[in-house]
Every structure is written in structure tokens, then in C-alpha cells.
């Protein structure tokens, strides 16, 4: 019997790597995608190149994965891992002065939106096709790496917040529509214990643990999976202050 497949878009050194490692330890074949081939590939994983700034490449990625490995039963959309102040951010963001977020030009906004949202739309559609081809015993789970920016604007990161907000809506819509089919859609959002934005201290290992748990659940849970490292899922009140300032 062949191993189930987890397809991870955005194979960064923090979340992407730890999620892949967690699933491989549970018997999955992990297929990681990134714009450039890794300089030091891990022999435990398989790799496919793809550029999330071009939504059409997502379709090509799924085609390659199906041809080489089979239908993915878990799809993790971790965006395009960039680096800022030596920390991984699981998305595309073009920073601006907080006093002038709309200084961003249209091509830059479109590029970031493609990575954060438009390619997510394509990935969801392709995942639905894969899930329909899999048996009911398969996980059939789609996970989008989120954060608290769909609740509050954070100065200087408007393109990221716009993408996260739109993608959160798509995940909520998919979770509601496809739960009767046994498909699951989640927007995990790591928080500090007081409910504030996880920020640059997010834990790849904590993400990996909750992603694996969500893949194992038999039915759709809350699409918004706010969680705290070492605790797991926490349902914060709607009026929780998510800002990073104290």
C-alpha cells in the first residue's frame, strides 16, 4: 500500500520543514514546493518547483505531483517563505511606512495577492479534485497558514493583511460547503497566550503538531484554528486584542 501524500506549498526552514518532518514521521510522503530548488535537499522529502506568484503554476504543480506520486490527501498552503529580520514569514509582504500603506504600486500588490490569495484559490480547486478522487478513509484536509491579520491591520504590512483576510474567507467558505463530503479546511493562527499576534516568534514545531492533529480529525472542526504553543487550540473571545503592542 502506497504512503499518503502531503503536498506543502512554501517549503521554508521553519513551518514548511517542521510540518514535512512531522508528517513523514507518521508515514506520509512529503512533497515540498518552492520557487527555487533547495541547495541542500533533505533525502526524506521529495521536491517540485513552482512559483506561487504565477497562479497557473499551482495547476502545473498538482499535475506533476499526481503524475509522479499520486493524489495528495493533505495540502498545506504555507505561502512563499520570505525572510525579514532573520525570521521566516509564511507569506508575501511588501513593507511600507505605517503612515502610508497605499504607497505600494499595483504590480507589487498583484504579486503579493497572487502569492497570498489567488494561488490559494487555485490550490483549493485542485485540492477538491484530488479529494474527490480519494477514498473516504483518506484525510482530505486543506490547511492554510494564517495569522491574526484578518482581525486587525498591522502597520506597514497591508499587502499581507489583505491576502490573509481574503484567504481566511475562502477557507471559511470551503469548510462550510464541503464538510458534508468529509473534506476539511483550516486556517491555523498561532497566538501568544493572551491572544495577541504570534508575530516573528512563531513555532514551526507547534504548527506541525496542530497540522498533524487536524489531518487526523474525522470531521470538520472550527475553520479558524487559533492555537498557542504548548497548549494547542484555544477559542479566544471575539473582542480579544490581537495587537502586538502592550
From Swiss-Prot:
Q: One Pfam family of this protein, by short name?
A: adh_short
Question: What pathway is it annotated to?
Answer: Secondary metabolite biosynthesis
Q: Which residues form the active site?
A: 164
Write down the CDD domains for this protein, in alphabetical order: SDR_c
EC annotation from Swiss-Prot or TrEMBL: 1.1.1.-
InterPro entries named in the record: NAD(P)-bd_dom_sf, SDR_fam
| Stated name of the protein | Short chain dehydrogenase/reductase dmxR12
Question: Which species is this record about?
Answer: Cryptosporiopsis sp. (strain 8999)
Amino acid at each position: 500500500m502506497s504512503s499518503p501524500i502531503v503536498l506543502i506549498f512554501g517549503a521554508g526552514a521553519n513551518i514548511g520543514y517542521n510540518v514535512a518532518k512531522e508528517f513523514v514521521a507518521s508515514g506520509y510522503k512529503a512533497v515540498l514546493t518552492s520557487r527555487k530548488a533547495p541547495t541542500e535537499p533533505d533525502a526524506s522529502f521529495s521536491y517540485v518547483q513552482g512559483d506561487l506568484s504565477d497562479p497557473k503554476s499551482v495547476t502545473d504543480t498538482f499535475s506533476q505531483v499526481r503524475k509522479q506520486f499520486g493524489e495528495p490527501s493533505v495540502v498545506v498552503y504555507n505561502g512563499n517563505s520570505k525572510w525579514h529580520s532573520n525570521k521566516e514569514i509564511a507569506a508575501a509582504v511588501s513593507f511600507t511606512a505605517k503612515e502610508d500603506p497605499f504607497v505600494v504600486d499595483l504590480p507589487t500588490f498583484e504579486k503579493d495577492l497572487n502569492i497570498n490569495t489567488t494561488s490559494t484559490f487555485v490550490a483549493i480547486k485542485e485540492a477538491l479534485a484530488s479529494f474527490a478522487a480519494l477514498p473516504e478513509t483518506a484525510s482530505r484536509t486543506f490547511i492554510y497558514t494564517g495569522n491574526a491579520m484578518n482581525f486587525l491591520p498591522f502597520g506597514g504590512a497591508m499587502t499581507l493583511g489583505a491576502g490573509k483576510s481574503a484567504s481566511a474567507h475562502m477557507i471559511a467558505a470551503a469548510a462550510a460547503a464541503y464538510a458534508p463530503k468529509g473534506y476539511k479546511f483550516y486556517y491555523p493562527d498561532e497566538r501568544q497566550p493572551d491572544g495577541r499576534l504570534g508575530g516573528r516568534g512563531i513555532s514551526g514545531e507547534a504548527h506541525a503538531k496542530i497540522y498533524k492533529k487536524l489531518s487526523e480529525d474525522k470531521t470538520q472542526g472550527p475553520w479558524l484554528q487559533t492555537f498557542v504553543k504548548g497548549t494547542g487550540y484555544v477559542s479566544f473571545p471575539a473582542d480579544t486584542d490581537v495587537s502586538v503592542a502592550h
